Swiss-Prot record:
<dbReference type="InterPro" id="IPR050140">
    <property type="entry name" value="SRY-related_HMG-box_TF-like"/>
</dbReference>
<dbReference type="GO" id="GO:0043565">
    <property type="term" value="F:sequence-specific DNA binding"/>
</dbReference>
<keyword id="KW-0238">DNA-binding</keyword>
<dbReference type="GO" id="GO:0007507">
    <property type="term" value="P:heart development"/>
</dbReference>
<dbReference type="InterPro" id="IPR033392">
    <property type="entry name" value="Sox7/17/18_central"/>
</dbReference>
<dbReference type="GO" id="GO:0001228">
    <property type="term" value="F:DNA-binding transcription activator activity, RNA polymerase II-specific"/>
</dbReference>
<keyword id="KW-0217">Developmental protein</keyword>
<keyword id="KW-0010">Activator</keyword>
<dbReference type="GO" id="GO:0005634">
    <property type="term" value="C:nucleus"/>
</dbReference>
<protein>
    <recommendedName>
        <fullName>Transcription factor Sox-7</fullName>
    </recommendedName>
</protein>
<dbReference type="GO" id="GO:0048793">
    <property type="term" value="P:pronephros development"/>
</dbReference>
<dbReference type="InterPro" id="IPR009071">
    <property type="entry name" value="HMG_box_dom"/>
</dbReference>
<keyword id="KW-0221">Differentiation</keyword>
<keyword id="KW-0805">Transcription regulation</keyword>
<feature type="compositionally biased region" description="Basic and acidic residues">
    <location>
        <begin position="32"/>
        <end position="41"/>
    </location>
</feature>
<dbReference type="GO" id="GO:0030178">
    <property type="term" value="P:negative regulation of Wnt signaling pathway"/>
</dbReference>
<dbReference type="GO" id="GO:0045944">
    <property type="term" value="P:positive regulation of transcription by RNA polymerase II"/>
</dbReference>
Amino acid sequence: MTTLMGSYSWTESLDCSPMDGDLSDGLSPHRSPREKGSETRIRRPMNAFMVWAKDERKRLAVQNPDLHNAELSKMLGKSWKALSPAQKRPYVEEAERLRVQHMQDYPNYKYRPRRKKQIKRICKRVDTGFLLGSLSKDQNSVPDTRGCRTAMEKEENGGYPGAALSDIRHYRETPSNGNKYDQTYPYGLPTPPEMSPLEAIDQDQSFYSTSCSEDCHSHINGAVYPPEYSRSPILCSHLSQVPIPQPGSSMIPPVPTCPPAYYSSSYHSIHNYHAHLGQLSPPPEHPHYDTIDQISQAELLGEMDRNEFDQYLNTSLQDPTEMTIHGHVQVSQASDIQPSETSLISVLADATATYYNSYSVS
């Protein structure tokens, strides 16, 4: 073994240690590069403020041992500015002497400012081999031959596996006029998956371009409200359809003809996809006064007793003993009232009831 190692020249350097070589040459022991740089670095000559602050800083540090060095520097700066030019002159002359001496000692000196220390990065690069090795827990698993997919492909696929995606695409591409038993649905479901109501609305955008007048006309004709959600068989209609005589027409304010916009004109487009969407949720419950909009004025007038206001208008013409009370309605048994007065009273009662009804709704 020794004969083999003796044939190589690099084994001679192993005989003596590097420390022995350094000591034999009379050199100092090995030092770090930072210490060497501090020794070889040439300091700049002090200016007048540095010459003055050299002794003044020591004096302030003794007087205020608890102050930080930054606070001492602020105090020194204020004190230096407060000095007069006559007081600064000896320090300026001393600084000039140091500058000349520095030029004689280092004629080729050039000021090189120190570079700012770079902040160490906390996040270091991880070796790809180590990362792949830590992720692959099963050594016998087959690698993916398709490679890495982009983020756009992942968003389009939505995280579904390949087989499920193919089934969903096949279901979407299947024509709707075919036999329902021939269609294949994903995940082995006997019925198609429910679609989002927003997706169904997006498929038919033409219904959203209708104007308010067309919506009102369609609501009046009764072509939008489905039978299972309508609360009353009679829809809202205009007051022009109710026969009211001329004297009471000025007391009636106009009533809006547009019904509530909960069921918009796009209801039929959603109803066409009823097989895919399932049963829609019922409309939200409104207070009781909203249902008055869906009851016609004719029905309200038909339920009102026209003789209700006669007791207030004809009290002076009849005997109090002739009046009877039935529940909450007081009916008068007057026989001396002419038919013309009765019709006028009925018209005023109808107009008053209609006015208060429309006022309470609005």
